[in-house]
């Protein structure tokens, strides 16, 4: 493709094919001569390539990465002090409960839609309908990768969820029991094994943005890291650094990783493709109407966001300052430093005057998100409130993240001296001093925590990091004053705190529990 440029026209047919007809045959028995019935589809390579494109859409739609995952999950991190706005922000302030927040029920089925579409492709493709082995491997590799991707977010957001690896053929299979996280992670690894062996190392320009063998290795290595299988994580992540051509962008282009400039670049290991849409309809599964650029309102400043926005907490800025890191600081946090600019190149203090005044009224520092906030899209008055016309790709895994995950896996495998050079590659790009090679395991662990703040804040990793490091209670619990003497969610009040045994996971959506009595609610909800 370039995947984002023609994704939507190509997937229209496949999306309509996957729509379930809710009409009873006794009520309506009319055939649509323009419709494509499933028996008439999946006949050749072109059909399967269309099906692959349709498989991506639930992930990029507004009900998942197009918007909902940001306010529903990623903004729970300690970086963001959320200004409350009705039910829209209760999940990002750690106050969400079934019945008083919207987003969990939106995200959950999107992931299973992608899994269903991947299962259909895997089951229907064969040597007869796609005789070309290379083409068949490309199609299957993408299906296995996206099924693993969807299951990765299911297990890390909800924990005990159904593991659906085939299309249902019996009534019993329509009501699956939850699987253990161990079984889900094993299935993720198995699918990524298939993806690694089938996907190409790179795609032609017209298909840039599709997952590659490097994408699959990186996600498999990440899965091993999260499940504490450190030696396996090292093997996979090191292979990404040795057998592929990924590189860090130079310091002068660091912020290209978060704008519409230079998408699918040499640092991108896997990124979701977005195309700005003029005709937006909330929640639809029709390409061109239900996908937003990255729904930038969740990263825009308070006086530009219709949901009241948020502020960056001062302890995040302090990590940059302690390390002398201005390259990543200036690309991550918008605030009043010499030469700081706002939207469209307007001086920061002029462009952010109302936001700065609001910070003063709230008694907090005037620090704002810069990544994915659309600063390069024009002056503030030209920025669409919903962001649907922007079309900024979201970089799911960057090479810098691979280097830091590799360093972490090596350090956890008691090899701090081997870990440090990989951290220093990331620091060198940021033009800051290298770490001493004599640091011990505990010191390297803290260095990785800090480095991930400087490199990855605002990209959707921090909350997952805090949970897997067992730091979420320390940083977000009721006793935390890490944010300049305040709780990181102080603007939402005293109930906006992390609760151990509950907030590690989201709740299973109530409609899913009502539809399937075999499911059970997560602890604390």
Question: Over which residues does each language-model region extend?
Answer:
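Bacterial N-terminal signal peptides
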Residues: 11-19
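Flexible, polar/acidic helix-loop-strand segments at domain edges
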Residues: 95, 267, 319-398
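Conserved, well-structured interaction surfaces
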Residues: 44-45, 49-53, 57-63, 84-158, ...
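Acidic, glycine-rich segments characteristic of secretory precursors and extracytoplasmic regions
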Residues: 2, 23-73, 182, 321-324, ...
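Long, intrinsically disordered, low-complexity segments
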Residues: 23-24, 81-82, 111-114, 187, ...
């Amino acid at each position: 493709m370039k995947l984002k440029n023609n994704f939507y026209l190509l997937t229209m047919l496949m999306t309509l094919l996957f729509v379930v007809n809710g009409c009873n045959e006794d009520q309506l028995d009319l055939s649509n001569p323009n419709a494509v019935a499933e028996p008439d589809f999946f006949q050749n390579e072109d059909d399967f390539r269309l099906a692959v494109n349709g498989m991506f859409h639930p992930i990029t739609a507004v009900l998942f990465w197009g918007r909902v995952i940001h306010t529903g999950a990623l903004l729970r991190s300690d970086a963001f002090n959320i200004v409350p706005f009705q039910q829209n922000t209760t999940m990002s302030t750690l106050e969400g409960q079934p019945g008083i927040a919207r987003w969990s029920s939106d995200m959950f089925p999107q992931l299973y839609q992608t899994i269903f579409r991947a299962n259909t492709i895997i089951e229907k493709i064969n040597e007869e309908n796609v005789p070309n082995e290379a083409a068949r491997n490309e199609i299957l590799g993408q299906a296995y990768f996206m099924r693993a991707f969807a299951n990765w977010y299911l297990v890390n957001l909800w924990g005990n969820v159904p593991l659906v690896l085939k299309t249902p053929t019996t009534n019993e299979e329509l009501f699956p029991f939850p699987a253990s996280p161990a079984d889900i992670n094993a299935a993720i690894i198995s699918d990524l094994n298939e993806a690694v062996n089938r996907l190409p190392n790179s795609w032609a320009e017209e298909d840039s943005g599709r997952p590659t063998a490097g994408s699959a290795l990186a996600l498999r290595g990440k899965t091993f890291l999260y499940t504490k299988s450190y030696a396996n994580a090292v093997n996979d992540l090191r292979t990404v650094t040795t057998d592929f051509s990924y590189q860090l962008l130079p310091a002068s282009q660091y912020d290209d990783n978060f704008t519409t400039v230079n998408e699918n670049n040499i640092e991108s290991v896997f990124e979701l493709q977005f195309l700005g849409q003029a005709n937006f309809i909330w929640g639809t599964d029709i390409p061109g109407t239900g996908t937003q650029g990255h729904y930038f309102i969740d990263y825009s400043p308070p006086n530009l966001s219709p949901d009241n926005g948020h502020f960056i907490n001062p302890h995040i800025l302090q990590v940059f300052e302690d390390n002398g890191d201005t390259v990543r600081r200036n690309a991550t946090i918008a605030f009043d430093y010499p030469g700081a600019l706002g939207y469209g190149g307007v001086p920061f203090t002029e462009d952010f005057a109302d936001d700065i005044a609001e910070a003063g009224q709230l008694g907090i520092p005037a620090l704002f998100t810069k990544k994915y906030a659309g600063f390069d899209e024009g002056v503030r008055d030209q920025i669409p409130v919903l962001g649907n016309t922007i079309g900024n790709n979201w970089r799911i895994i960057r090479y810098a993240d691979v280097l830091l995950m590799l360093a972490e896996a090596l350090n956890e495998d008691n090899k701090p001296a081997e870990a440090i050079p990989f951290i220093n590659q990331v620091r060198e790009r940021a033009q800051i001093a290298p770490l001493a090679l004599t640091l011990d395991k505990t010191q390297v662990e803290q260095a990785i925590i800090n480095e991930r703040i400087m490199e990855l804040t605002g990209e959707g990793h921090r909350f997952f990091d805090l949970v897997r490091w067992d730091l979420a209670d320390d940083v977000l619990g009721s006793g935390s004053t890490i944010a300049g003497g305040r709780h990181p969610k102080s603007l939402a009040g005293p109930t906006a705190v992390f609760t151990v045994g509950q907030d590690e996971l989201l709740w299973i959506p109530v409609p899913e529990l009502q539809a399937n009595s075999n499911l059970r609610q997560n602890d604390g909800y």
